[in-house]
Every structure is written in structure tokens, then in C-alpha cells.
Regions:
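A short, Lys/Arg-rich alpha-helix, primarily the initiator
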Residues: 6-34, 80
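Short alpha-helical DNA-recognition segment
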Residues: 33-51
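Short, compact, well-ordered microdomains
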Residues: 68-69, 77-80
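Short, charged recognition helix plus adjacent turn
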Residues: 79-96
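Short, basic-rich loop-to-helix N-cap that marks the start of a DNA-contacting helix
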Residues: 56-70
Length: 96
């Protein structure tokens, strides 16, 4: 990732963001949930859930609300993870 600086030119340490699908996969596995059943419970096809785990799909507001209802982890948290990841990717692309 490229360096990020404030207006005074001081380098800022940016945390490494990860795709929220990675965290979701860990959460599902820790709870002992079956992936196919979980996909149905949040209104996704199993293949789409798999793509989410791999970072090939994003968590949008609808999915975030479904995750909140199913897992008890706020929609804002899921969207925050997605936003942090998206910003990191955008910064990397700008600094290439």
C-alpha cells in the first residue's frame, strides 16, 4: 500500500483493511453454521456467498442488514468494514 500523508506532510499509519468476507467466513465457522443454510438465511445463493468470502463480492446495505438480523452484528459494522476495504484498494490504485 502506498504511503498516506496529512496536509503537513507527516506520514500517517493506515491500518491494513481486509475484505469483510474474510471476517464473515471466520464468524460463520466459529459459530458452526453450515454455509449453504446460512446463504439461504440471508437471501444469497451459496455460490454468491462463496464469492463474498473470497472478496469477489461486496457487502451492500441489504446484505449488511441481513447479517445484522442473522448474526447480531450491526449493519453499520459490516458497511464500515466494506468501506475501509474499498478505501484501501482505491488508495493503492491511486499510488500505483
Amino acid at each position: 500500500m502506498g504511503n498516506v500523508f496529512d496536509k503537513a506532510g507527516n506520514e500517517l499509519k493506515t491500518p491494513v483493511a481486509f475484505h469483510p468476507g474474510e471476517f464473515l467466513l471466520e464468524e460463520i465457522e466459529e459459530r458452526g453454521l453450515k454455509k449453504t443454510e446460512f446463504a439461504k438465511s440471508i437471501g444469497l445463493l451459496p455460490g454468491n456467498l462463496s464469492e463474498l468470502f473470497k472478496g469477489k463480492r461486496h457487502i451492500n446495505a441489504r446484505i449488511a442488514v441481513k447479517l445484522e438480523m442473522t448474526l447480531g452484528i450491526s449493519a453499520e459494522y459490516w458497511l464500515g468494514l466494506q468501506s475501509a476495504y474499498d478505501l484501501q484498494v482505491a488508495r493503492e490504485l491511486v499510488h500505483v
